[in-house]
Regions:
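Enzymes and membrane/adaptor proteins characterized by extended Gly/Ser/Thr/Asp/Glu-rich
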Residues: 46-182, 201, 206-215
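Mature N-terminal segment immediately following signal peptide/propeptide cleavage
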Residues: 18-48
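Sec-dependent N-terminal signal peptides
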Residues: 1-9
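Bacterial Sec-dependent signal peptides at the C-terminal "C-region" and cleavage site
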Residues: 8-22
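Phosphate/pyrophosphate-binding betaalpha-module
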Residues: 190-199
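Conserved Rossmann-like nucleotide-binding pocket used by diverse enzymes
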Residues: 9, 151, 198
Length: 215
């Protein structure tokens, strides 16, 4: 599955003379069992040089050199060092590393240099579905510029419980039809500009009264 996702994300990196399906199968066939298992692993890390001890950075590079890593969950970064670190990792990797991040409120949520966008409920409150598309477009263009391929967003929970402490304004609305309309436009804004989307969370999460991160 991960190889197929990489095929979608890195489509522009494959020479036109190569068949995309053939590239995917050839890449998979060349991997050892350990390397295939490694492709199923996602490594979470900050990509700020100040947060990474030398020994941790060397450990990551050793993982890439030995068996590879399938994905990298991007926590926090900065323009001055993150791109250099990502380029180093991608260059050393036998298979392109799929980089993901949880970006609901714009790239600013992970990169101080990024654009901060309104919560989803505020976007829906504008009454203009095209605004959701434009926000998705902004998020996608900025994310791709810093090497991110996959966004863990949007939130498609229906906020039908006013006592919900964790979904609230992260949802587009308490109306399922509004959530569907605006989430679809946001997803199209991401995908049309080269960023994978994730519709989350669990069914019914909008009707809870506890924080799922701590309960």
């Amino acid at each position: 599955i991960l190889i197929l996702i990489l095929l979608f994300v890195f489509n522009g990196c494959i020479p036109p003379s190569l068949n995309k399906d053939k590239w995917s199968q050839d890449t998979l066939d060349k991997l050892t069992l350990r390397e295939k298992i490694a492709q199923m692993m996602i490594y979470r890390m900050n990509l700020r040089m100040k947060d990474i001890p030398v020994e941790k950075w060397e450990e990551i590079l050793e993982l890439i050199d030995k068996d590879g890593i399938g994905g990298l969950h991007f926590w926090y970064g900065e323009a001055s060092t993150s791109l250099t670190m990502l380029n180093t990792m991608q260059t050393r990797s036998k298979v392109p590393i799929l980089v993901d991040a949880d970006i609901e409120h714009g790239l600013h949520q992970r990169f101080p240099e990024g654009t901060e966008v309104p919560p989803f409920m505020a976007i829906a409150a504008s009454g203009r579905p095209e605004n959701a598309y434009e926000v998705g477009k902004i998020v996608a263009k900025e994310s791709r510029a810093v090497g991110i391929h996959w966004n863990f967003s949007p939130v498609v929970d229906v906020n039908n419980n006013p006592n919900n402490p964790i979904i609230n304004v992260r949802s587009f609305s308490e109306d399922p039809s509004v959530v569907s309309l605006y989430a679809t436009q946001y997803i199209l804004g991401l995908q049309d500009n080269g960023l994978l989307a994730t519709a989350k969370h669990f069914p019914g999460h909008g009707d809870t009264e506890t924080d799922s991160h701590s309960s």
